[in-house]
Amino acid sequence: MKILVAVAVFFLVSTQLFAEEIGANDDLNYWSDWSDSDQIKEAMPEPFEHLLQRIARRPKPQQFFGLMGKRDADSSIEKQVALLKALYGHGQISHKRHKTDSFVGLMGKRALNSVAYERSAMQNYERRRK
């Protein structure tokens, strides 16, 4: 354990000395040179600029994946238009929603009535014990 601490201290001291040697060679005053934007642009390497542009770029709307999954921009607009037409009497919705006694959410399937839910929970518990 003491050897590990000694190696860590040696590493930190050597990096500090190396950083001081590099800092002594630089004659730049970073606080006064912020007005020279041309000098800053020239000093910035190409890959670093590219990385900053990638970070600053915002995703396109069709690249957004929400909780509902991937959405296609064209089909969602068509679905909205069809829904508006159906609501205002210009068309029909062909698919109907069938209500059941269970709800499937993010946490899994849940029963809407508590008696069926308790019964299924007890059956699952007894099935696991066997």
Curated annotation (Swiss-Prot):
The modification Methionine amide is found at M68, M107. The keyword Secreted applies. One of its GO terms (biological process) is positive regulation of acute inflammatory response. Residues 1-19 form the signal peptide. Residues 20-56 form a propeptide. GO terms for cellular component: axon; extracellular region; extracellular space; neuronal cell body; neuronal dense core vesicle; synapse. One of its GO terms (molecular function) is substance P receptor binding. The record marks P59, K60, Q63, F64, F65, G66, L67 as: Cleavage. InterPro entries: Tachy_Neuro_lke_CS (IPR013055), Tachykinin_dom (IPR008215), Tachykinin_fam (IPR008216). Coiled coil: none annotated. Keywords: Amidation, Cleavage on pair of basic residues, Neuropeptide, Neurotransmitter, Secreted, Signal. It is found in: Secreted. Tachykinins are active peptides which excite neurons, evoke behavioral responses, are potent vasodilators and secretagogues, and contract (directly or indirectly) many smooth muscles. Belongs to the tachykinin family. This is Protachykinin-1. It comes from Rattus norvegicus (Rat). The lineage of its organism: Eukaryota, Metazoa, Chordata, Craniata, Vertebrata. The gene is Tac1.
